[in-house]
């Protein structure tokens, strides 16, 4: 073997090890929000999304914009029940299910710019939760909303420019759940829908809403795709709330990163630093 061949093999090995390190999580440490930073939150976290430089957390009465290290940049109020959020081409979309008596059972989709200035509201005749954008189409949860355990849900689809009327599709995610879809994410090819179900949690669908499979991955309060340029594969993130009732600690949130591989979500933040 020549020196040139040895050099090329060594270079290829180092490159492979570098990308393996990225793929298996050494570059995606868990992120913690500051204790008490989100005390203004109403109820529990409803959904989350990320841009190239910020996170967005949706709660029942508003949306937070946070830095990548979990500190608040801005908060805006929104009508209850404000639900899941998604980020697409510089804009934030929020699914809303109205809770007031006059509009109970109806909802809307709010469109914001990246600084959370409201651009427009698209009114709907159904309550909504769970939202993402794929191929310039908004996918949103459209019921049912009952707490009683049931199987099957309904998804609405509308162009991201809101031209035309929404289409509705009945789906079977393969397992019983409470309420409708809670959070939706995408890797640019498939849809990942999170439901209230501790046994499975996430149903995977094609863009035409054909079922692909289910994942045992609880992520009903915050789940999204994470924009980054380090790998060709999509990285997802999950948000969980952490607190200790006995110690009367103020809650904080932990963001971990995951990759979809062989029908499973692989944890890329295996070393979750304690706070």
Give the ranges of each region predicted by the language model.
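A short beta-strand motif characteristic of beta-propeller blades
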Residues: 30-39, 70-77, 116-122, 164-175, ...
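Repeated scaffold domains used in trafficking and secretory/extracellular systems
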Residues: 42-47, 79-87, 124-135, 176-184, ...
